[in-house]
Amino acid sequence: MRFFPWGFWLLCVASAPARGDSGSKARSCAEVRQLYGAKGFSLNGVPQAEISGEHLRICPQGYTCCTSEMEENFANKSRSEFEAMMKEAGRSVQTILTAQYKSFDNYFQDLLNKSEKALYDTFPSLYGDLYTQNMKVFKDLYSELRRYYRGSNINLEEALNEFWTRLLERLFKLMNAQYHITDEYLDCMVKHAEQHKPFGEVPRDLKVKATRAFIVARSYAQGFLVGSDVVKKVSQVSLSHECTRAVMKLMYCPHCRGMASVKPCSNYCLNVVKGCLANQADLNTEWKYLMDALVAVADRIDGPYNVDTVIGTIHMRISEAISNLQENKVSITAKVFQGCGNPKVSMKGSSSEDKKRRGKVTLEAKSSAVALEMLVLDAKGNLTALKSYWVTLPGVLCSKKIMASPAEDDKCWNGMTKGSYLPEVMGGGLANQINNPEVEVDITKPDMTIRQQIMQLKIMTNRLGNANIGNDVDFQDASDDMSGSGSGDSCPDDVCVKRLSKSPSTRQPETHAIPKQSGHGVIGASSRSLPSAFLLFLSGASIVVQHLWR
């Protein structure tokens, strides 16, 4: 009986905070209801005023306007919205790279088309039968050049050698129509004639210049396509389970807490996004190498390899070669007859060499060097601007898409309440996320889709490096099928269920300007937790009091 007054007093003290808290008025959930409905969800079951938040699995468990279903729906929504942000950012880069590809491709194809058209327009009047009876040889040449540019596995030097051989055979036969020339005789003729350069220096000179020009042109065009394709595939990588939780907490938990107008802290947002885009940031090094390689090749295109002059004058070089053959016809024929013997005279009559063509006729080629210069300048500017895309992406998403608060703001959403955000900002890349306070990142398991794209960047950069020094490289079509990654499941249990290793309750006290929590909120929730604490205190105090009264 002596214990009763002490026990009664302690019970009164323990129950006092609870009675005081019950008198406070819960805040309205009107803002959250409006947002929830605007996102396309039904308002059935949505609280009118704050409720107890012990059921929450992602957001802090204080008073809340969100039910379990709302939290799950918001988690799904945050994931889809974040992935949409990534795709939108990626599309802007794809648009730039694709536009550069199309600009150069149109320019290059136009050069080739104009050269071919000039040949078709002028050669009939210049060479008569020498051209009209051998049109297919010229068409095949331009067809092979286009196929090479498009990435077909063609040896360009062999294709050019084949063209000159076929042209020599056809022209020699046509210029010596009075003779019966067999295929065996043509084989012998080619061996002897080539020793005496029937076309002059044109074949060798054109082979060197055209090969270099086509190598850099197709590598340059392909580089833009590969870059665009890499961005497209990386932008489609699904958000991980851990990131879905972190992004939900960043974007929608303040609404659940009744802080709809409070923006996320800038550094808090950066840590979330850097953790979620850790694998993407690892593209940075190879991405910069690709951009630099494209700039270097652009300088070659508008410089030493002079694509405009070489490609735009192919028809003129062919005309020059034919002129050389006509001028050297007598000596070349004599040397061939000497080495291969005199062919039999044909019953068809004398040579059908066209009388229209005597002497050299100068063909004109309209230069588009200014257009190429402007095209290259524009490309170099865009490539330089895109070099830092992957490292600046988190900042861009936070400032322009998520609309995070300025870094100096100390009244922003820090993941638990309104206040300052104290943790340092993590570096970019997978290895730097080992201590990320917002996202649990397994740095031992890199994303394989992104690793494959890093390899694609390396391969393309190597091709551009070879092209830059005039080396031909094997090519493959970069427009392979899109490969999706991940499923579209909505907030699985292992996403919404609290993680043991990095839940809100494991935050260090210095992380935010609030005390450490174990699933409880800050406003109102702390007072509701006091009875439990006092009852624990009561148990211990009772033992002490009983001991003192003995």
Curated annotation (Swiss-Prot):
InterPro entries: Glypican (IPR001863), Glypican_CS (IPR019803). It is a lipid-anchor; GPI-anchor. PROSITE patterns: GLYPICAN (PS01207). O-glycosylated with heparan sulfate. GO terms for biological process: cell migration; negative regulation of fibroblast growth factor receptor signaling pathway; negative regulation of satellite cell differentiation; negative regulation of skeletal muscle satellite cell proliferation; positive regulation of skeletal muscle satellite cell differentiation; positive regulation of skeletal muscle satellite cell proliferation; regulation of protein localization to membrane. The keyword Membrane applies. Keywords: Cell membrane, Disulfide bond, Endosome, Glycoprotein, GPI-anchor, Heparan sulfate, Lipoprotein, Membrane, Proteoglycan, Secreted, Signal. Its main location: membrane. Residues 475-494, 502-522 are annotated as: Disordered. Residues 1-20 form the signal peptide. Glycans are attached at residues 76, 113, 382, 483, 485, 487. It comes from the Eukaryota. One of its GO terms (molecular function) is fibroblast growth factor binding. It holds the Pfam family Glypican. Residues 481-494 have a biased composition (Low complexity). A lipid is attached at residue 524 (GPI-anchor amidated glycine). One of its GO terms (cellular component) is synapse. Disulfide bonds join 29-65, 59-253, 66-256, 188-340, 243-276, 265-412, 269-398. Coiled coil: none annotated. It is found in: Cell membrane; Endosome. Belongs to the glypican family. Cell surface proteoglycan that bears heparan sulfate. Modulates Wnt-signaling pathway. This is Glypican-1. The gene is GPC1.
